[in-house]
Swiss-Prot record:
UniProt cross-references to InterPro entries, sorted A to Z: AAA+_ATPase, ABC3_permease_C, ABC_transporter-like_ATP-bd, ABC_transporter-like_CS, MacB-like_ATP-bd, MacB_PCD, Macrolide_Exporter_MacB, P-loop_NTPase
Name recorded for this polypeptide: Macrolide export ATP-binding/permease protein MacB
Binding site for ATP: G53, Q54, S55, G56, S57, G58, K59, S60
Gene: macB
Organism: Psychrobacter arcticus (strain DSM 17307 / VKM B-2377 / 273-4)
Domain of life: Bacteria
Length: 665
């Protein structure tokens, strides 16, 4: 209901507030205690009413019901002609926000924010524009003699000054109806008189004032006095000398209301600010709460980085076997009975046919044998491999010195050889550069034209015995006298699916041979096995690390439950000034999420530090490689943990009863 509707009601002398047959009962174990008995009451716009009674008489309970902080057990209570008995919590909050202002005996100011911000809180929930909100808060404080205290916190103010801040807060959204609970109870006599005069001035401006007190002197200042005893109204009379003022003011909220989205953003920022203040107030507790999240996120990111680094290192070693290669080997598949009758099926022409395919980059035929090799007085058994001119490309081997084979080496069947590091150490232990030296392979001489780099990888082709390489044509004609090759290796274009290339080569070979008298091995299957194995190990270890995240999340929930308990009074104050349940839930949910996000960021930072340390210690042999996906996932995960584990505490806070919350210190 707008302020215009309010004043229309007043003009027609309709009751502003009307109570009929109101009863309020409380459960106390097995018993039911009735605090208010059949209360009937009518209050009109512009009245200044004092409800007087001793402690336990039910006056504060009645005020809580009138202020929509509590609801009656039975009977009817109407505000502006509308029954509030069946209103939802957020609808009651709307009434409090737009029409009620509360002045409490114990002030109930938020200790972590300034006087101006305390006064502004109701307007945040009402959706008032930020600049207008601050200007009005400062104006109200100035009107109440606190112009020089706008930036002071409650702890820096006297009791009288704090009560004035409380009054300014009650007026922030217009304060059509001011409910004051023992407004002078905690003040000295001078401050008490000042507060009474302020209330009378507000009544003169048209505000409806309802005071709850046990002081007859304060009650005598009101236009109307209602005496209550043991839950019954025993007297209701007017002070004859009191002059009732005429309402002459306009709405404050409607002039400066923001859009629904703008109001939501304001409330979000308010929640964010209060979350930061709460975290700052308990730095050590917040850090310890974050610790589980920090360790969990750091563990997950580090483990994924270690897994990625291990995978890359293994794949780098696999490259010594030839990257994306397919090996075609002579002979029927194992288990085929034809295998024992025919093993000579592959020819150099088969290798050339495969090399001519558009998806094949290069091919190297291969034969293998073991022979005695001699150099001067050194004789040793060695592995001899006949290879093609593209062997270095398909195998991934590199030369330490010298050169490889070329087209002429194959065509002319040259007696050139390339030796590996084992052969270098075996036959030329004191010769740094053996290029040009001649070895005797069986009875065939071979001139050294190249030396291979040592391959220390776990997937190296090298064996412990010396290995010599020569053109496959030379080996076929001069050493073994055969027209067949044992195998050939094809290097596949990286842009082509390795499995598709394997299928195409298999079909080509079957069409040439008319049968599958060959075997195919795809090096990509090794890589896939390694990748799947390291991924499985990473997932396993990550799942263990995630347990730390869950423990951290439980820690966040535990601390947030403690925070809700500690800040129950603050929750009650916010509800009293009009905060919706969603506003309260949002505030504590943001705090939980903020703790987890900060913990996540610190965890990611710790993971980078751990990775840098490992990279420095491991050198080139081992690296931690971070994945942007894992970092983003870790950040999202920490946020979700805040939402999931912060929901229960936030929900508990939102479901608190305003009266019960205000009663706690």
């Amino acid at each position: 209901m707008s302020s215009q509707d309010l004043y229309a009601n007043a003009a027609t002398d309709k009751p502003l507030m009307q109570v009929k047959g109101l009863i309020r009962e409380f459960k106390a174990g097995e018993q039911t205690i009735r605090v208010l008995h059949d209360i009937n009451l009518t209050i009109h716009q512009g009245e200044m009413v004092a409800i007087i009674g001793q402690s336990g008489s039910g006056k504060s309970t009645l005020m809580n019901i009138l202020g929509c902080l509590d609801q009656a057990t039975a009977g009817d209570y109407q505000v502006f002609g509308q029954s509030v008995n069946r209103l939802a919590p957020d609808e009651l909050a709307k009434l409090r926000r737009e029409h009620f202002g509360f002045i409490f005996q114990r002030y109930h100011l938020l200790g972590d924010i300034s006087a101006r911000d305390n006064v502004s809180v109701p307007a945040v929930y009402a959706g008032m524009d930020g600049q207008a909100r601050n200007e009005r808060a400062e104006q109200l404080l100035s009107d109440l003699g606190l112009a020089d205290k706008v930036n002071n916190r409650p702890s820096q103010l006297s009791g009288g000054q704090q009560q004035r801040v409380s009054i300014a807060r009650a007026l922030m959204n217009g304060g059509d109806i001011i409910l004051a609970d023992e407004p002078t109870g905690a003040l000295d006599s001078k401050s008490g008189k000042d507060v009474v005069q302020i209330l009378k001035n507000l009544n003169a401006q048209g505000h409806t004032i309802i005071m709850v007190t046990h002081d007859p002197g304060l009650a005598a200042q009101a236009e109307r006095v209602i005496e209550i005893k043991d839950g019954y109204i025993i007297a209701d009379y007017k002070n004859e000398d009191y002059q009732r003022p005429v309402a002459q003011f306009s709405s404050i909220i409607d002039k400066h209301r923001k859009s629904a989205f703008g109001s939501f953003i304001d409330r979000l920022l308010e929640s964010f600010k209060m979350s930061l203040l709460a975290m700052r107030a308990h730095k050590m507790r917040t850090l310890l709460t974050m610790l589980g999240i920090i360790i969990g996120i750091a563990s997950v990111v580090s483990v994924v980085g270690l897994g990625k680094g291990s995978q890359e290192q293994i794949l780098s070693n696999i490259s010594s076997l030839g990257t994306n290669t397919i090996t075609i080997t002579d002979g029927y598949p194992y288990g085929d009975p034809r295998r024992q009758y025919n093993d000579d099926n592959l020819t150099p022409q088969d290798a050339q046919a495969v090399a001519d395919q558009p998806y094949v980059l290069s091919v190297s035929p291969q034969l293998n044998s073991n022979m005695s090799v001699r150099y001067r007085n050194v004789q040793e058994a060695a592995s001899i491999s006949g290879v093609g001119k593209d062997y270095l490309d398909v195998s991934g081997e590199t030369l330490a010195m010298g050169q490889g084979f070329d087209e002429q080496s194959i065509l002319r069947r040259t007696q050139d050889i390339i030796i590996d590091s084992n052969a270098h150490k075996t036959f030329f232990p004191t010769t740094a550069n053996p290029i040009g030296e001649v070895l005797l392979i069986g009875s065939v001489p071979g001139r050294v034209i190249g030396v291979l780099e040592p391959n220390e990888g776990g997937f190296s082709r090298s064996v412990d015995s010396p290995t010599l390489y020569m053109p496959y044509t030379t080996m076929m004609s001069r050493l073994i006298g055969s027209a067949y090759i044992e195998s050939f290796v094809a290097l596949i274009d990286n842009n082509i699916s390795s499995s598709a290339a394997e299928s195409a080569i298999s079909n080509l070979m079957k069409s040439r041979h008319g049968t599958d008298d060959f075997r195919i091995r795809n090096s990509d299957s090794i890589r896939q096995t390694i990748e799947s194995t390291t991924a499985a190990m990473t997932l396993l270890i990550s799942s263990i690390a995630i347990i730390s995240l869950i423990v951290g999340g439980i820690g966040v929930m535990n601390i947030m439950l403690v925070s809700v308990t500690e800040r129950t009074n603050e929750i009650g104050v916010r509800m009293a000034v009009g905060a919706r349940q969603s506003d309260i839930m949002q505030q504590f949910l943001i705090e939980a999420v903020l703790v987890c996000i900060l913990g996540g960021l610190l965890g990611i930072g710790m993971a980078f530090a751990i990775g840098e340390l490992i990279n420095r210690v491991g050198g080139d042999s081992f690296k931690v490689i971070y994945s942007s996906t894992s970092i983003i996932a870790a950040f999202v995960c920490s946020t979700l943990i805040g939402v999931v584990f912060g929901f229960l505490p936030a929900r508990n806070a939102a479901k608190l009863d305003p009266v019960e919350a205000l009663s706690r210190d």
